[in-house]
Every structure is written in structure tokens, then in C-alpha cells.
Amino acid sequence: MENLPPGYRPNVGVCLINSDNLVFVASRLNVPGAWQMPQGGIEDGEDPKSAAMRELQEETGVVSAEIVSEVPNWLTYDFPPAVKAKVNRLWGGEWHGQAQKWYLVRLRNDEDEKEINLANNEADSEFAEWKWAKPEEVVEQAVDYKRPTYEEVIKTFGSFLNDTGRAAKCKSAKW
């Protein structure tokens, strides 16, 4: 992977939008009140686009979606000390943070929202609930250390996110 800064875990992020150009976010089970877009590590030998679609399916159950755009460069964020210690134990590395390749992905149609399943038949779901949010809400509700990255993602995809509709109510992972 070209232009990847050393010391940063290769990762992808997915800005999933619906037909109203609202953005999918989910609240983390381990960080109450923190909402985020789907993201995850790139596996050995995997290209970033494939990783993005795999992560989308793993975290949301969505398979009927298409990549619309991408952020041309890698975006990075540093882990706060407590998060860094935890993830380095978990991942078995010495990572300063994550380098992310971001993709804008659109549901193929509104019926595809029915696919969203945070548990996705896995016992270890990362999320408690999900919702469709306006772009500015995505940034406001992110954890502090991810906000600059989210701001850049929303800015880059801004032309696709204009004229957004109303945010939908939260959806429980257990529905």
C-alpha cells in the first residue's frame, strides 16, 4: 500500500449513505454516546476497496451497496494513550494510530436498509444501535480523536451529501 505512514495500522473507513444522503453511524458498545462510521483493518494481501466492502458487511450486514467515491489520500489519527495501550495489546503491535482509506458507499435502494443487522450473526457485535445522521451530526457525535478525520471525510464527500433529509430514529441492534 503506497504512501502509508510508518507506525499506523492500515485501515479502511466507510461513509455509507442512503437515498436521502444521510450517513450511517452506530454507537459503540464499549464507549456509550460515541457514534462512528464502519471501519476496520486491512488484512494481509487485501486491497483497500475489498477491505471496505468486507468491513461494511461484517459490521452492518449490508451487501447491496456500491462505492461512489473515495478520499484520494490516507487520513491518519493518533490513539490517545489509554486506547493505544489497549489496541496494541489486542492487535499485538506497536501502533501510534490508524491510517485510513475512506470510501463513500451508497445503498443500492431504500429496501436495502432492511439488510442492516449490527450483530450480523456474530456473537461479538461492536455496536448497540444505529441511525441515519446528517453529516454535521456525524462529526459532532464522534470521539474527540477521530473528529478531524471525520471532518475531512465529510468535507471531501460534501458534494454527495448536500440536501440531506431528516435523520431517522435510532435502530436497536436487536430488532
UniProtKB/Swiss-Prot annotation:
Cofactor: Mn(2+)
Enzyme Commission code(s) on record: 3.6.1.17
pH dependence: Optimum pH is 8.0. Active from pH 6.8 to 9.5.
Record keywords: Hydrolase, Magnesium, Manganese, Metal-binding
UniProt keyword Hydrolase present: yes
Source domain of life: Eukaryota
GO molecular function: bis(5'-nucleosyl)-tetraphosphatase (asymmetrical) activity; guanosine-3',5'-bis(diphosphate) 3'-diphosphatase activity; metal ion binding
Ligand binding (Mn(2+)): G40, E55, E59
InterPro entries: Nudix_hydrolase, NUDIX_hydrolase-like_dom_sf, NUDIX_hydrolase_CS, NUDIX_hydrolase_dom, RppH
Residues of the Nudix hydrolase domain: 7-155
GO biological process, one term: diadenosine tetraphosphate catabolic process
Catalytic activity: P(1),P(4)-bis(5'-guanosyl) tetraphosphate + H2O = GMP + GTP + 2 H(+)
This protein's record includes keyword Cell membrane: no
Cited PANTHER family: NUDIX HYDROLASE 25, UDP/ADP-SUGAR PYROPHOSPHATASE
HAMAP family: Nudix_RppH (MF_00298)
Family: Belongs to the Nudix hydrolase family.
Protein name: Nudix hydrolase 25
GN (gene name): NUDT25
